[in-house]
Amino acid sequence: MSASTTELRRDAEVIGWVGFAHLLSHFFQLILAPLFPLIKDEFGVGYAALGLMVSVMYTVSGVSQTMAGFVVDRYGARRVLLFGIVAFSLALLLTGLATSYWMLLAIALLAGVGNSVFHPADFAILNAKVNPKRLGYAFSTHGIGGNFGWLVAPVFSIGISTAYGWRAATIAAGVLGLLIAAVVATRTALSDAEPDAGAQRGKALGAPGPGLRQDLRTLLSGPVLKCFGFFTFYSMALIGLQTFSVSGTTALYGAPLVTASGALTGFLFGGIVGIVAGGVAAAHSSRHNLVAASGMAIGAALTLLLASGALPLWSLAGVMTLIGFFTFSTQPSRDILVRAATPPGATGKVYGFVYSGLDLGGSLSPLLFGWMLDRHMPQWVFGAAALFMLATVAMVLTLRPRRAAEVAPSCPSGR
């Protein structure tokens, strides 16, 4: 077997397992939401209280994600990834055993810690292990895995809860996660991705590790902050549409629930196809900022069309599908731009920091969009989403990555 074939197989295995880990994290995130009506009745709480659980999880995840990145750079991505899978699995298992709402709230803290590790660990592994010419495909597979996790979770939780109750569904998800963690622990393809390659090279040369001041200077540099801003606005736009587009289209267009739900489904499936197309574009383009800006600008224009309230009902699903396609197609190029803003030895902390912008946007967006719907402004569900998309365009077009010499791929020259 030739060296190139061996490398391709190794890259494919790494990409596959990291994509599967991302699928698992999104699967975990959406296990509970379909069960809320059952949990609400059993514990005698309202949806606001259950929503607080979700906010607690994402707040803890956002705060912990940057710290998880530091741990990844220090101790290695594989160990941290395993910790996250086990922690999130235990949180779901304990949810099935909870006897009060306050226990659920405490368990949400553990779930947030578990959720925080996936992005910094995943991207540290991909950047360290995969040939740079395949990173577009790697990041695309990573994004597709996450979307499929969201699609599978409701089927899993509703299917098991219908037959055996909601507790059985969460316990089954937790046990499944622990079994998967045991399998991931045996995957040697991930084992030499730790610690961060840049940090290791520095140690090998006898160079001291960067101090806290240098770490903060890295995280607060212009390129990294613009990546953080992109992720925050991106999350506010897309989480707003995912969460409130059904309510927005029913209020603005008088659309039947089945039509509005079909439009959301189109958005999600368009996103999956968009990530695939975006991976191909990222693999064949060096102008990643233009790829990302174009996708978000087209998505914003289509979303403004929805905000007009002038579209016929039959077109809603098609327009939402196109919005999903163009906005999600930016993900692989977006992740390569983060790589370009990352100095050697800082992969985990930078990806952890910028991806915490997703959690920040996910925490703020429901409050804003819900407020607009409560005040009978459904057009602004789409108008605000479009404005946030345009903000991402501004972030990415003004982004100036580090010099090429500073972002040379952290892999042997033969790769």
Predicted regions, residues:
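Juxtamembrane intracellular "pre-TM" segments in multi-pass secondary transporters
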Residues: S2-R9, E194-K226
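Extracytoplasmic gate region of multi-pass secondary transporters
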Residues: L32-A33, P223-L268, I272
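Conserved MFS/SLC helix-loop-helix module at the cytosolic interface between two early adjacent transmembrane helices
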Residues: V63-T99
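Helix-to-loop junctions at the C-terminal end of transmembrane segments
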Residues: S64-G76, I275-R287, L373-D374
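Cytoplasmic membrane-interface "Motif A"-like loop-to-helix N-cap segments
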Residues: R74-I85, A283-M296
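Cytoplasmic helix-loop-helix junction between adjacent transmembrane helices
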Residues: I107-G146
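Helix-loop-helix hairpin linking two adjacent transmembrane segments in secondary transporters
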Residues: H142-L190
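C-terminal transmembrane helical hairpin of 12-TM major facilitator-type secondary transporters
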Residues: H288-R334
